């Protein structure tokens, strides 16, 4: 399995490196030049290494990102052939915004395959490698705004599979009443793009503005009433905000020095890039057309498509995903329309959701899952993943779906409207690497130095109950003066080990807080750049 950080400037991908500070509460990132003193760090102000953060040095939109990804794969699989699967099949899984860049990528890769095979590709030497494409899996994908926007109001009010009223009826009615104008604006975006930017490259300023304005209007009037009034999590409507789940521990893990060293990366990991996000949004990438057509193209060329949704997600509602699957125009459309919703038998005793499947297309409603489906339902997600890859029916994993004639068609319920009771998501806790998980009063305590922080966890009754061994070790270390954690008060004694790790660039000399790990109290001069360590 390969984890592909794209477009450039997200995750561990970078163009050029720059030294920065990052405020965990505000999200503000500030560049440090060669003469800027390295500031003292605390539980919310961290230093590290990021990409350039130049918005001109990333891909502009899903189509341009797809082109860049193809060039990368041409190099990757030829320079590192041992990473190619034994059967040479390549599949792609993408989540959330991946509902757009997943289809854009996979369809472009297949188009390039066909150009190479019929000798119409006039690219450079060494870019003739055929990518044998197998499956596109989209998890909680926002794929087509025109199709999916009408399903946000019902996800917010009663018709979400749980009877949850996240907003009141007045707000719900306002959301519903906004749908016609929203769709009109999206259609205007698409009509304008069809004339002046049909390939969705973001090359026409008027198209960019019309499409961005359409998305802004729709979001303001259909999505924001939920986020502003419900008090519930955007990615799990059963949970009040801030959400206790899923954990953001990967953020701390991927920024540990030993992890970075093992991966051979010279910078800090970041979950998202404002520059990359803005580059996509500024051209109005969200409401543009073609992603449905891309899915139909893939299906007609024998490539499997699985659309997987969590029924507690508000970001990309599951009923909208169901509508997308029905709206795909492909040679199997009539067969898919005749399919029914079958129970997904995760194991002998648990039903993990519903699936509608015909041939190579499947749509899944995953029970009791928010936006990050594998975190909520790991076994069900794993079974869906493996069954899709190995040409087995999603419902049971016992029937082959590989036949091109008399394709498999699921049977079961006529509608996916099973009503459930939401399960308890557990105790909430504040993880300072993800400030959105913290209540305002916790943030205030962190900022004024009165909080007790252990491995980026805000220490309170909940975290002591949830992570007793971790908290106990931190407190023992503090008592012994070993500093494994962030201590209490103003964090002056013992000196905290820095939570945001990485290395600076260009041989910059700086001062860093070393902590007692090296037996030094205070600051240590570094000749090889800024080295931030964490116990």
Which residues make up each language-model segment?
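Short mixed-charge
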Residues: 112-132, 330-359, 410-420, 426
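Gly/Ala-rich beta-loop-alpha elbow adjacent to hydrolase catalytic centers
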Residues: 5, 94, 98, 102
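Short glycine-enriched nucleophile-adjacent loop
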Residues: 99-114, 136
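Accessory cap/linker subdomain of secreted extracellular hydrolases
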Residues: 3-66, 75, 84, 91, ...
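Acidic beta-to-alpha connecting loop that harbors the catalytic carboxylate
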Residues: 97, 311-312, 368-370
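Cleavable C-terminal sorting propeptides in eukaryotic secreted/cell-surface proteins
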Residues: 501-535
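Post-His helix in hydrolase/transferase enzymes
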Residues: 375-387
